[in-house]
Amino acid sequence: MAVAELEKKVFELTTVEKLVGWARSGSMWPMTFGLACCAVEMMHVGAARYDLDRFGIIFRPSPRQSDVMIVAGTLCNKMAPALRKVYDQMPEPRWVISMGSCANGGGYYHYSYSVVRGCDRIVPVDVYVPGCPPTAEALLYGIIQLQNKIRRKPVLEA
């Protein structure tokens, strides 16, 4: 190829870390873990008005096909082992979004004997979405924040 032909072509220069971060953030497949009224708002996000497909987000029915878990609602003590089991079945790398006051810290039922005071006591949480219940826009903002976090995280570690 002549130098004149190469000058006309457009090249994109980047690092492997930026490329992998872009690919991971652009193809998030969430596993929904709806426990209460926040799950209804999570369903709104999946509808046509917000169109998560444009962000590369497709809800998956199996934890083995997912890389993001959205915990939406009140986590009780009996459900905590199931949450951990589903989290452990997800392949690495995996991320967790805690959606709503109940998932974040127990919410209205904080002092109940049967409620876990935050799902971060069971699984590590990457993004907290506040609200009771949070709006679909708030969850969408949380998903965008998780995408930004994934892009910033180094992929290759020495």
From Swiss-Prot:
Class of the enzyme per the UniProt entry, highest EC level: translocase
Stored Pfam families: Oxidored_q6
GO biological process terms, semicolon-separated: aerobic respiration; electron transport coupled proton transport
Membrane topology: Peripheral membrane protein
GO terms assigned for molecular function: 4 iron, 4 sulfur cluster binding; iron ion binding; NADH dehydrogenase (ubiquinone) activity; NADH:ubiquinone reductase (non-electrogenic) activity; quinone binding
Reactions the enzyme catalyzes: a quinone + NADH + 5 H(+)(in) = a quinol + NAD(+) + 4 H(+)(out)
E.C. no: 7.1.1.-
Cellular compartments per GO CC: plasma membrane; respiratory chain complex I
Subcellular location, principal: membrane
Superkingdom per UniProt: Bacteria
Record keywords, A-Z: 4Fe-4S, Cell inner membrane, Cell membrane, Iron, Iron-sulfur, Membrane, Metal-binding, NAD, Quinone, Translocase, Transport, Ubiquinone
Swiss-Prot/TrEMBL cofactor(s): [4Fe-4S] cluster
Chain positions recorded as [4Fe-4S] cluster binding sites: 37-38, 102, 132
Matches recorded under PROSITE patterns: COMPLEX1_20K
Cofactor: binding comment: Binds 1 [4Fe-4S] cluster.
Gene3D superfamilies in the cross-refs: 3.40.50.12280
Record localization: Cell inner membrane
InterPro entries in the cross-refs: NADH_UbQ_OxRdtase-like_20kDa, NADH_UQ_OxRdtase_20Kd_su
Complexes and interactors: NDH-1 is composed of 14 different subunits. Subunits NuoB, C, D, E, F, and G constitute the peripheral sector of the complex.
Described function: NDH-1 shuttles electrons from NADH, via FMN and iron-sulfur (Fe-S) centers, to quinones in the respiratory chain. Couples the redox reaction to proton translocation (for every two electrons transferred, four hydrogen ions are translocated across the cytoplasmic membrane), and thus conserves the redox energy in a proton gradient.
PANTHER family attached to this UniProt entry: NADH DEHYDROGENASE (PTHR11995), NADH DEHYDROGENASE [UBIQUINONE] IRON-SULFUR PROTEIN 7, MITOCHONDRIAL (PTHR11995:SF14)
Similarity-based family: Belongs to the complex I 20 kDa subunit family.
HAMAP family membership: NDH1_NuoB (MF_01356)
Protein name from the UniProt record: NADH-quinone oxidoreductase subunit B
Source organism (scientific name): Legionella pneumophila (strain Corby)
Lineage of origin: Bacteria, Pseudomonadati, Pseudomonadota, Gammaproteobacteria, Legionellales
Gene giving rise to this polypeptide: nuoB
